[in-house]
Swiss-Prot record:
GO cellular component: extracellular region
Signal peptide start-end: 1-22
Family, per entry: Belongs to the frog skin active peptide (FSAP) family. Ocellatin subfamily.
Name of the protein: Ocellatin-PT3
Propiece residue ranges: 23-39
Task of the protein: Has antibacterial activity against Gram-negative bacterium E.coli ATCC 25922 (MIC=320 uM) but not against S.pneumoniae ATCC 700603, S.choleraesuis ATCC 14028 or Gram-positive bacterium S.aureus ATCC 29313. Shows no hemolytic activity and no cytotoxicity.
UniProt keyword list: Amidation, Amphibian defense peptide, Antibiotic, Antimicrobial, Cleavage on pair of basic residues, Secreted, Signal
Tissue expression summary: Expressed by the skin glands.
Length: 66
């Protein structure tokens, strides 16, 4: 009976260790995805800002001519 308890304990322990390793890898993958999303948002914000500046400059030039 003691042998079965030790075996069961060992199986449960190894299962918990493998689960914790998988969780760590999952967190790292999620962090990498978050970094990519932040970079995409940064590029889009730059493009939007440049577009707004370009439109404002064009409107300013048109207003000067009128």
């Amino acid at each position: 009976m003691a042998f079965l308890k030790k075996s069961l304990f060992l199986v449960l322990f190894l299962g918990l260790v493998s689960l914790s390793i998988c969780d760590e890898e999952k967190r790292q993958d999620e962090d990498d995805d978050d970094d990519d999303d932040e970079e995409k948002r940064g590029v889009i914000d730059i493009i939007k800002g440049a577009g707004k500046d370009l439109i404002a400059h064009a409107i300013g030039k048109l207003a000067e001519k009128v």
